[in-house]
UniProtKB/Swiss-Prot annotation:
It is found in: Cytoplasm; Nucleus. Coiled coil: none annotated. Residues 1-37 are annotated as: Disordered. One of its GO terms (biological process) is ribosomal large subunit export from nucleus. Involved in nuclear export, actin cytoskeleton organization and vesicular transport. One of its GO terms (cellular component) is nucleus. Pfam families: BCCIP. This is Protein BCP1. GO terms for molecular function: protein folding chaperone. InterPro entries: BCP1_family. Keywords: Cytoplasm, Nucleus, Protein transport, Transport.
Amino acid sequence: MVHAVKLSELSKRKRDVEEDSDVDISTTDSESDQDADGDEEIINIDFDFFNGNPGVDFHALKNLLRQLFGQQEANRMQLSTLADIILQSPTTTIKTDGQESDPYCFLSFVDYKEHRTSDYAKYLVNLDPRLETFFATIDNSDKTCALILCERLINMPVEVVPPLYNITLNDVSSNSSDGKHFDFYLVVSRKYEVSFDMDSDSEDESAKPRKRVKGSELDYFHEEDRHMEKYAKICFQGPTRKGVVPLYMVLDHEGLVRSIGDLEQAIASWK
């Protein structure tokens, strides 16, 4: 599978990801600095969507997994084994320099029941009582669950996310023996603390100028998580480490599809 996408038209229209033909797309980098005249730098980049390549992608996937989980959590699991599982599962990577180059982004749907004895599945089951209960329910039913793993370099544009998900979901259905999708999805992601200064409260406002104190709020590393969280059946956060907060969400199929649709609409509204 190869889907060639040029970043420029992702900003101009929604992409029908089920088209087999290449799509020519160009966009303005949303994070590029404007010069004194207000002009924006235009960056044209070709993004190619490939299936996971075991002969090329292994080490890059391990690095992206380490970025996703953070070093401390990554040390609690066998990343090499997890990378192998990802490369055996429906996985889409995004590259800019051909199939033999390192991926800048990946999305994988790992079948929980197929890999329930894996180190990663056991890690998730033991992570929180809510997940333990959820997986026990899946184990004792005919329902299916995919463990979603998705990470990208920080400068990857969010516009690639809807086609990335739609392509991979289509691959899952196409490669399934019954042509069906998964019933549930567990998404592991993260947020980060945004620090800011604020005025401290004082009972006597006339006594002294109010002090500036540090506050913080949370924002998303992955913009799609903002929309997924709205539809999550289970959603909770892990302990904060160095300003990074793990995020865990369980969605049903309808919720996942709707969240990606909402992201597409949000992206279209930015233009």
